[in-house]
C-alpha cells in the first residue's frame, strides 16, 4: 500500500531534509530487491511439515523477463491508481508466462533507522504476541487473495504444471503462520505473492535480527537470503522450499530463545520500511481487491478521493514531533491509511473520521487486519478509533479535537465554505495543537488588525513546508503543505500594545 517499503514506486524513497529550492521532478524506476522466505509446504489440498518428495521444477527453454492510502471524506482531488508497495521482482512476458527472473545483486544490510525522533517512553514490542498462550486468530492469508480471484490472471511459479504449491511463512511475532500460493500474476500490477515473501524476509533481517545472528541471514555464501536468491536464479523449487524451511526454523529458534524479544526491546521507534511493509500487507488484503468502490467521487464537492503517501506522512510526523503519549486526528481519513500509520509508526492514540460509506467499510476491514498484522510482526500499535459521518457533526470528533496534539486535514480540494467552517473549530483546540493542511487556513500576508480581532485565524502561527514528487496520489509533482500551530501569544501581544 509504500502504502507504505522503500521499494514502492510512489512515496517511499529515503526521507530527505526539505530545502526551499526548485527541483526537477523526475520519475525513477523502483529498485529491485531480492529476498524471500516461506515455511511448511503442502500440495493444494493439504499442507506438509516436511517435504517428503522434493519436486524438481522444470526450467523453461525461453528466457524470463525481469521482473496506504489515504482517502479523504470531504474533498479530495481525483487520485491516480495507487501503486502498491510491492517491488518488481517477478513478472511474465508473452514469451514465458511461468518462469521467474530477478535481480540477484547481493547487498549488505544498511541499518535502517526511524525517520522520527526516538521516543524513549515508547515500547514497540507486543508482549502478548510472544507469550506461550497466544491463541489462533482470524487473518486474511495471501493465498486467500488468489482464491478470491479464482486463480484468474495467475500462473504457477517455477514452471510447475500440477499445482499450485502452498507454503507457510513464519513471522517474528505470533507463532501463527501465513499461507502463500507460489504463483505469478500475468498482469504486472497484480498481487505478487513471491514478492511479498521476499520482502518479509528482507524486512525481518533488517529490523529483527541482532548483529550476532546476522550472518545466518546475510552470509554471502550460504546465508538464508543468498540461498533463496540462488534458488530463484536457478528456478529450483526444491532449493526454494528448503531455504524457506530453514528460514522458518531459524525464526522459531530465535523467537523461543528470546533473541527477537531482546532486540525489539532495545528499540523505541520503527523504521519506515517496516511500517510500509505492514501497511502494504494490510492494504493488499483488504482494499486492493475492492479498490473500484473508491472511484465514486463528485468533482467540485467535498467528497473526492485522494491519498497522502507514507513518505510524506512520516515527514509530517517528524515535523510535528508527534509522540506516543499524544493524540493524532485525521479529518477525512478515507480508508484509514494515515490513522493506521500514526498508530504503528508513532504508537500514539489515533483517530479518523470519514463520511464516504465505501471508504468507511474498507477502513474497518483495514483496521481489523491491521491488528492481526501487528500481532504477526510482534508490534504494539497505539489505539485506533475510526468514526463514520461528517466530522463537523460527529460529537465524539468535536470532543477529541479538544485533546488533539496534531490534526491532519487534507483540504486540497475542499470547498471554501468547508474551509471556513473548519476555522471555527480551531477556537476549541488546545494551545500548541498543530494543524497540518495542504492549503493554508491563513491567507498570505495576513496581519492582526483592529477590524479582524475576532477572526480565529489570528490564533494560528503558520509555516510553509515542501514535499517532493510522488508524495501524494493525485499528482507526480512536488508541492507544499502547511503546519499551523495554535498560538494565542501574538493576539495577546497585539491587544496589550493597543491599550
From Swiss-Prot:
Residues 178-499 form the DOT1 domain. It comes from the Eukaryota. Keywords: Chromatin regulator, Methyltransferase, Nucleus, Repeat, S-adenosyl-L-methionine, Transcription, Transcription regulation, Transferase. It catalyses: L-lysyl(79)-[histone H3] + 3 S-adenosyl-L-methionine = N(6),N(6),N(6)-trimethyl-L-lysyl(79)-[histone H3] + 3 S-adenosyl-L-homocysteine + 3 H(+). The keyword Transferase applies. S-adenosyl-L-methionine binds at residues 305-308, 328-337, 354, 390-391. One of its GO terms (biological process) is DNA repair. Gene3D superfamilies: 1.10.260.170, Vaccinia Virus protein VP39. The keyword Zinc does not apply. Residues 51-66 have a biased composition (Low complexity). Residues 1-96 are annotated as: Disordered. Residues 67-82 have a biased composition (Basic residues). It is found in: Nucleus. GO terms for cellular component: chromosome, telomeric region; nucleosome; nucleus. Pfam families: DOT1. Its EC number is 2.1.1.360. GO terms for molecular function: histone binding; histone H3K79 trimethyltransferase activity. Ubiquitination of histone H2B to form H2BK123ub1 is required for efficient DOT1 methyltransferase activity on histone H3. Belongs to the class I-like SAM-binding methyltransferase superfamily. DOT1 family. Histone methyltransferase that specifically trimethylates histone H3 to form H3K79me3. This methylation is required for telomere silencing and for the pachytene checkpoint during the meiotic cell cycle by allowing the recruitment of RAD9 to double strand breaks. Nucleosomes are preferred as substrate compared to free histone. In contrast to other lysine histone methyltransferases, it does not contain a SET domain, suggesting the existence of another mechanism for methylation of lysine residues of histones. This is Histone-lysine N-methyltransferase, H3 lysine-79 specific.
Amino acid at each position: 500500500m509504500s502504502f507504505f517499503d522503500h521499494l514502492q514506486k510512489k512515496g517511499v524513497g529515503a526521507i530527505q531534509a526539505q530545502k526551499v529550492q526548485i527541483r526537477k521532478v523526475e520519475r525513477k524506476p523502483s529498485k529491485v530487491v531480492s529476498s524471500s522466505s516461506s515455511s511448511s509446504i503442502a500440495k493444494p489440498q493439504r499442507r506438509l511439515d516436511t517435504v517428503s518428495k522434493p519436486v524438481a521444477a522444470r526450467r523453461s527453454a525461453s528466457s524470463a523477463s525481469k521482473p496506504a492510502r489515504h482517502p479523504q471524506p470531504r474533498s479530495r482531488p481525483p487520485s491516480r491508481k495507487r501503486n502498491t508497495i510491492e517491488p518488481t521482482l517477478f513478472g511474465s512476458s508473452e514469451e514465458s508466462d511461468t518462469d521467474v527472473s530477478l535481480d540477484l545483486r547481493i547487498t549488505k544490510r544498511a541499518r535502517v533507522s526511524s525517520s522520527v525522533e526516538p521516543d524513549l517512553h515508547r515500547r514497540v514490542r507486543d508482549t502478548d504476541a510472544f507469550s506461550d498462550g497466544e491463541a489462533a486468530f482470524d487473518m486474511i492469508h495471501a493465498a486467500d487473495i488468489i482464491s478470491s480471484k479464482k486463480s484468474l490472471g495467475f500462473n504457477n511459479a517455477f514452471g510447475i504444471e500440477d499445482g499450485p504449491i502452498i507454503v507457510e511463512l513464519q513471522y517474528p511475532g505470533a507463532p501463527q503462520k501465513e499461507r502463500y500460493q507460489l504463483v505469478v500474476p500475468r498482469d504486472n500490477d497484480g498481487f505478487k505473492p513471491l514478492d511479498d515473501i521476499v520482502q518479509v524476509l528482507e524486512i525481518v533481517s533488517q529490523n529483527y535480527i541482532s548483529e550476532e545472528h546476522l550472518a545466518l541471514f546475510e552470509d554471502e555464501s550460504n546465508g538464508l537470503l543468498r540461498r533463496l536468491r540462488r534458488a530463484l536464479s536457478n528456478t529450483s523449487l526444491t532449493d526454494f522450499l528448503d531455504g524457506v524451511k530453514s528460514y522458518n526454523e531459524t525464526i522459531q529458534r530465535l523467537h523461543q530463545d528470546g533473541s527477537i524479544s531482546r532486540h525489539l526491546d532495545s528499540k523505541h521507534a520503527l523504521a519506515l520500511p517496516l511500517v510500509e511493509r505492514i501497511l502494504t500487507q494490510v492494504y493488499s488484503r483488504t482494499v486492493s481487491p475492492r479498490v473500484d468502490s473508491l472511484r465514486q467521487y463528485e468533482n467540485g464537492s467535498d467528497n473526492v478521493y485522494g491519498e497522502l503517501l507514507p513518505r510524506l506522512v512520516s515527514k509530517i510526523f517528524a515535523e510535528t514531533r508527534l509522540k506516543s503519549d499524544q493524540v493524532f486526528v485525521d479529518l477525512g481519513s478515507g480508508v484509514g491509511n494515515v490513522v493506521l500509520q500514526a498508530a504503528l509508526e508513532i504508537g500514539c492514540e489515533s483517530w479518523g473520521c470519514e463520511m464516504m460509506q465505501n471508504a468507511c467499510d474498507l477502513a474497518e476491514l483495514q483496521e481489523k487486519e491491521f491488528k492481526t498484522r501487528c500481532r504477526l510482526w510482534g508490534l504494539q500499535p497505539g489505539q485506533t478509533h475510526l468514526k463514520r459521518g461528517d466530522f463537523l457533526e460527529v460529537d465524539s470528533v468535536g470532543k477529541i479535537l479538544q485533546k488533539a496534539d496534531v490534526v491532519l486535514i487534507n483540504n486540497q480540494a475542499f470547498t471554501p465554505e468547508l474551509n471556513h467552517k473548519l476555522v471555527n473549530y480551531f477556537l476549541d483546540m488546545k494551545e500548541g495543537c498543530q494543524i497540518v493542511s495542504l492549503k493554508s487556513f491563513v491567507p498570505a500576508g495576513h496581519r492582526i488588525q483592529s477590524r479582524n480581532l475576532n477572526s480565529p485565524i489570528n490564533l494560528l502561527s503558520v509555516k510553509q513546508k515542501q514535499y517532493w514528487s510522488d508524495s501524494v496520489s493525485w499528482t507526480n509533482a512536488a508541492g507544499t503543505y502547511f503546519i499551523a500551530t495554535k498560538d494565542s501569544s501574538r493576539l495577546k501581544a497585539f491587544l496589550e500594545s493597543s491599550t
